[in-house]
Amino acid sequence: MRRLAVIAALGLALLGSVTAQADEAAGHYNLALQYKREGNTSAAIGECETAVKLRPDYAAAHFTLGNLYRAQGDYARAAGEYEKTVKLQPKDADAHTNLGAAYARLKRSDEAIRELETALDLKPDDYEAQLSLGFAYKQQGDYKHAIEHLQKATELQPDNPQGWANLGVAKSKTDDKEGAIVALKKAIALKSEDADLHFDLAVVYRRQKNTDAAIAEYQVAVQKNPKFAKAYYDLGMMYSQQRKNPEARAAFEKYLEYGSHEDAGYRKDAEERLKAFKGTASSDGQVAHAK
């Protein structure tokens, strides 16, 4: 009897310890949520990390920690937390969606597609899952399936520019350039200050050989983002085609001012074109002097 009493006492003590640890984990998690609402991401991460150390099976804390890492652009750590979440809660559609989106950001498109298809099996009308699945297919160059899911995303949230933007870019990779223009214009109507949208539309016009329309959109892109290096480079190329050398020279100079040194090919080309412009100007000056 005494032995049974000792075992029972130990069991109650262990249960009490586990309960206390779970309560402590919940306290840290609730504090993490408060920090998150206040915009203090680093403090929120610290509290979430403490919560999952105290209670490794705390699915909600793993999911929130994944979201916090994702907000910082740390998709590898985010994916790790979402992986733990789906193991603990395999029927959680949002966890599969966020894991798939993180995989897509990490260019693990096969795994992204698997997770996002699972998410849509659980929750067919989920905008984020449709959008991310379209993005993952676009990464693979499967524009047919990308367009299918991105089109669905725009139907679910027609006032969200992200769906239209991705749909436009996907269609621009096919023969449906007019469809791409329509989609990108809808995105711009919803978010006119986004320089990237104007750049994407300019690229479509350029592929159509609609030089004037392309230049107009590139100009808007650099107005919205005065340090948009690639837009300046493309502008320089378009002006060169029109033999507008002063405008081309100014655009290439802006590209060299703001462009990354990692883009060695573009930098070398811009530098060589500027040298050619200077040589032309020098020759023109000599001819004028001779006259």
Language-model region placement:
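Terminal, low-structured helical/coil segments at or just beyond the last alpha-helical repeat
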Residues: 25-26, 241-291
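Structural marker of alpha-solenoid helical repeat scaffolds
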Residues: 54, 88, 122, 156, ...
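Structural signature of tandem alpha-helical TPR/SEL1-like repeats
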Residues: 37-50, 71-84, 106-118, 128, ...
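N-terminal leader/linker segments that initiate helical-solenoid repeat arrays
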Residues: 18-49, 53-55, 59, 64, ...
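Bacterial N-terminal signal peptides
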Residues: 7-16
